[in-house]
Amino acid sequence: MTQKACCAAIDAHARELIELSKKIWERPEMGWTEKNASAWTADYLKKQGFAVERGAYGMPTAIRAVWGKGAPVVGFCGEYDCLPGLSQKVCPDFEPVVPSGLGHGCGHNLLGVGCVAACLGL
């Protein structure tokens, strides 16, 4: 697959990927408790044809999604947890949604969805 084809595969899902990222942003969850983000991500991958294992590796919110067989094997590690005290509206200035609340100040709502995009691109 060429770079152009990979990018086109991702672009074809851009709207859905952006919506997934926004959904995770709007419902921040601390590490090990990301039940919604995990479920939404797993559901999306399953809808795209991946074989999805929820609660992978003994972690309740971990996902293992498999596509195809054989070699090479490529793995991605996505994150979707948030941190306390980083609640933020979608704007460039500091404007918490909830003062001292949970938020995605480190962009994990983007990192997890970025890994989903990379999977789709391959």
Where are each of the predicted segments found?
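Acidic/His- and Gly-rich active-site-bordering loop/insert found
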Residues: 2-104, 109, 113-116, 120-121
